[in-house]
Design a protein with these regions (language model features):
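Ligand-binding pockets and gating/stacking loops
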Residues: 1-171
Length: 171
C-alpha cells in the first residue's frame, strides 16, 4: 500500500507541474506573445521540461510499464538558445563550433558573437556540464526508489553518450 501511495504521489507531482506550466503561461500575456510553444502542458523552462520527461521515464520504469526507454537531451543541430545556463549566450549548435567565434558562420544566429574561441569553448563546456547534471539528476532519482531491497537504478542499465566527440570537427 505504501509503495502504491508513493508511486501515485509521484504521478500527481508530474500532473501538478504540467498544470503549473499552463497556468504560468496563461497568467502572462507578454510571455504568451513571446513564446512559440509546441503545445499545452510543456513548461517554459527547458530544465523543467527535461526533468519532467526524465521523471516520466522514471515512472514508467517504476510501474514496470516498460523496460526500455530512449531520450535525446538535444539533437546535434539544435538551435536552442542556452542562455538559461548561467554564463552562456548563443545556441547549442553554434557553441559546438567553438573555434569559430566571430558570430559570422552559418551555424551562428548572426547576432551573438564571442570575444575568443576560449570564451566560446567555456560556454560550450558549461552547456555540456548542464546536460550531464540532468543525467545525474535522473540517476539520483532512480537510486532513490527502492524495489525488492534494491534501488531502481541497481536494477537498470543506463547508456549515456553523444553522437560526436568533437562537435566542431564533426568527429
Amino acid at each position: 500500500r505504501r509503495k502504491l501511495e508513493e508511486y501515485l504521489e509521484s504521478i500527481r507531482r508530474v500532473e501538478r507541474r504540467l498544470a503549473f506550466a499552463d497556468r504560468r503561461l496563461e497568467a502572462s500575456p507578454k510571455l504568451k506573445r513571446q513564446l512559440r510553444r509546441p503545445g499545452p502542458g510543456i513548461p517554459d523552462s527547458h530544465q523543467d521540461y527535461m526533468r519532467l520527461m526524465l521523471e516520466m521515464i522514471v515512472l514508467a520504469f517504476w510501474a514496470d510499464a516498460t523496460r526500455i526507454s530512449t531520450f535525446m537531451l538535444d539533437h546535434g543541430q539544435s538551435n536552442r538558445y542556452c542562455n538559461f545556463v548561467d554564463g552562456v549566450k548563443g545556441t547549442w549548435h553554434a557553441l559546438s563550433h567553438w573555434r569559430d567565434y566571430d558570430g559570422k558562420t552559418e551555424d551562428d544566429d548572426g547576432i551573438t558573437s564571442w570575444s575568443s574561441a576560449e570564451e566560446k569553448q567555456r560556454m560550450y563546456n558549461l552547456v555540456t556540464r548542464w546536460h550531464h547534471e540532468q543525467v545525474g539528476w535522473f540517476l539520483e532519482r532512480l537510486a532513490s526508489i527502492r524495489e525488492n531491497g534494491k534501488s531502481l537504478l541497481d536494477q537498470s542499465m543506463i547508456v549515456y553518450g553523444s553522437s560526436l566527440s568533437d562537435g566542431h570537427a564533426h568527429s
